[in-house]
Amino acid sequence: LSVSWRPTDRLHAYATIPRGLKTGGFNEQSFSDLITTAQQQALQAQISGRGGFDSSTIASATTYKPEHSWSYELGARYALPSAGLELSSSVYLMQVRDLQLTRFVASGAGRMVGNAGSSRTLGFELSATQRLWSSLRAHLNYSLTDARFTEETAAAKKGNFVPFIPRHTYSLMISANEPLSRHLRLLGEVEYSGLGEIYWREDNTTRESLQSTLRARLGLSYDRYTLALWGANLTDNSYTVFQAASPLGRLFQTSAPRTLGVDLSVKF
């Protein structure tokens, strides 16, 4: 369901209520663990003379259910071309049932998808662009996401944050694409961006705080050719971009260090 309203040429408001579905499926990587468990229980049954592997658990151990969601969003866009101004913002609510999350299998040698109960997400997004002078523009983007479990599970308490979803993401950028002559253009941009905090586990015992990085790019374009110097993570900030617990230990992926480069591109 979608409704839009345009009271003026500059203002556009809208409301949407979509329904989402992620299909269920099978976890192929969990079969090796299942076979190992069956062999161990069969051996124990031979020794003790009782028990054994319960084949009725195969379906629950290797499959996961579909994820269903309802989303409700209200938003507006405003443009004032004469002043070089563009604004947009939205608020939304998402309710999810049988949330699908990726976890490691018991042996640690693979991953599987599992259902993690229900969740709700409240969000706010803001985007703005302002022309400062000629082709020089300022850009602002911000997003607030509050995603929490709405029921208690074996791994998470009600009210815990859903893992791998940053609460804040933002970007402040200055960009320019200025003609110097008929064939020559000056290109440049500087961006300060960040995200966090992020929880890595359903029990919320590990997290990464808000982290920011700075990047820049400066170049010249002549007809089909562009030469640019660039730098990423100029402040050389070191932080965790991914973390997961497995039976083999805790796995980390850290941010790339300060990186400098040169690009040469040709348009055909």
Model-derived features with residue positions:
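Hydrophobic, lipid-facing positions within transmembrane beta-strands of outer-membrane proteins
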Residues: 1-3, 60, 70-74, 122-126, ...
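Residue-level signature of outer-membrane beta-barrel architecture
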Residues: 3-6, 66, 78-80, 130-131, ...
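Membrane-embedded beta-barrel scaffold of Gram-negative outer-membrane proteins
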Residues: 6, 12-14, 18, 39-115, ...
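Structural signature of outer-membrane beta-barrel domains
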Residues: 10, 20-24, 31-33, 81-83, ...
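C-terminal beta-signal and adjacent terminal beta-strands/loops
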Residues: 21, 193-201, 219-268
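Solvent-exposed loop segments that connect transmembrane elements
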Residues: 25-62, 101-114, 149-163, 243-253
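Short sequence motifs at beta-strands and strand-loop junctions characteristic
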Residues: 56, 63-68, 116-120, 132, ...
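Gram-negative outer-membrane beta-barrel transporters
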Residues: 84-96, 112-202, 263-267
